[in-house]
Amino acid sequence: MTLESMMACCLSDEVKESKRINAEIEKQLRRDKRDARRELKLLLLGTGESGKSTFIKQMRIIHGAGYSEEDKRGFTKLVYQNIFTAMQAMIRAMETLKILYKYEQNKANALLIREVDVEKVTTFEHQYVSAIKTLWEDPGIQECYDRRREYQLSDSAKYYLTDVDRIATLGYLPTQQDVLRVRVPTTGIIEYPFDLENIIFRMVDVGGQRSERRKWIHCFENVTSIMFLVALSEYDQVLVESDNENRMEESKALFRTIITYPWFQNSSVILFLNKKDLLEDKILYSHLVDYFPEFDGPQRDAQAAREFILKMFVDLNPDSDKIIYSHFTCATDTENIRFVFAAVKDTILQLNLKEYNLV
């Protein structure tokens, strides 16, 4: 074989390979285009601690693989850390609010717990378990807990602190509810894709604290639906970042901004009025009218309170043609979220029938 014929042969092989690669790329591009058409992007928005991360966890439980024993074990130290964080917040608040411990020994217990570096906590040693239990039973700490709207305390504090014995047992494995209740502030952007009826739902959770919000801008392209979470129980609370600003007013301001963004002109808006269980407890002793004087409904009435809050948010919508879909939720209740998201999924699919060739 001559050198020329060998080169021609090699060249034709290269051309064939190049054509094959090009064909593969074209095929992949067509596939990507088709998949993009069958992908719904759901953007979870809301202020800090409104329940967005819990909602994502529920999607993993309801529509994903859930949490294996190994996954749950990964939450163990976070549960311990949440317990220390909650007790430290109350110990600091005892001083600020000038509440006294009823039992003298709790001054020493408070000192012991206060000295713990929460981020280094990986175990739950007996001396700390004993100190936390004794502190939680102190009438002074209970009074401090009752005044929690005056400082920052996680919604899960009572859930964990009343169950310290179970959590302190040897070989403790967090339950699904323990996992749902764990509070870890979201920094950055978390995406959770799941497949439903041959459609990919890509749920995007972004940090709700003010410092996190400037990162949102990158998520604003091709959003099918905005899912905006409001914590119903925050009507009497102040912001983590500013202790003279009402959390619900901040949530309203953010919602107004979001629904008037030009990016979201074609996105449907679904409003989740979350933490309805906490509202039902709180409304019995903390009156909505004290924080929102325009409320003229009955006191201690959760139904009247939540309908008023819903109307406040819906009234922020300047576009009379745009429907705000709304649901009252409890993000830690799997069955409630299963039911609500089934309705949300149907709404989203109905609104996107033509575009996604679902008719």
Swiss-Prot record:
The keyword Cell membrane applies. Residues 178-186 are annotated as: G2 motif. PANTHER family: GTP-BINDING PROTEIN ALPHA SUBUNIT (PTHR10218), GUANINE NUCLEOTIDE-BINDING PROTEIN SUBUNIT ALPHA-11 (PTHR10218:SF328). Guanine nucleotide-binding proteins (G proteins) function as transducers downstream of G protein-coupled receptors (GPCRs) in numerous signaling cascades. The alpha chain contains the guanine nucleotide binding site and alternates between an active, GTP-bound state and an inactive, GDP-bound state. Signaling by an activated GPCR promotes GDP release and GTP binding. The alpha subunit has a low GTPase activity that converts bound GTP to GDP, thereby terminating the signal. Both GDP release and GTP hydrolysis are modulated by numerous regulatory proteins. This is Guanine nucleotide-binding protein subunit alpha-11. Pfam families: G-alpha (PF00503). Mg(2+) binds at S53, T186. Residues 38-359 form the G-alpha domain. GTP binds at residues 46-53, 180-183, 274-277, 331. The modification Deamidated glutamine is found at Q209.
